[in-house]
Regions:
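Short capping segments at the starts of secondary-structure elements
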Residues: 14-20
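N-terminal interaction modules that seed assembly of large macromolecular complexes
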Residues: 27-30, 63
Length: 87
């Protein structure tokens, strides 16, 4: 089993709620040291590949978020879709 791939899937599934380090350990059946290494390795993969997402740690939870460098594009998307909602 590729734990890195499973972790990525877990972060996708939990969405905005995020997931605690303890829960990651429980689900993957690993200790905190290995969980932190996997999170770090996955973040490095996102950075190396210049991906549009990253791992954020907010309110005691890890989750996938978009990169701040791309905010102007996300704002255009929100602006464009908000205008079509009234049709």
């Amino acid at each position: 089993m590729n734990k890195l791939a499973v972790l990525e899937g877990i972060l996708f599934v939990v969405g905005d709620e995020g997931i605690t380090l303890e829960k990651i350990c429980e689900v993957l059946e690993i200790d905190e040291k290995e969980a932190r290494k996997l999170l770090n390795d996955l973040q490095k993969e996102y950075e190396k590949a210049e991906r549009g997402i990253r791992i954020s740690y907010l309110s005691n939870s890890f989750k996938l978020t978009t990169k701040k460098e791309h905010i102007e594009y996300y704002q255009k998307l929100v602006k464009d879709t908000s205008g079509t909602e009234t049709l």
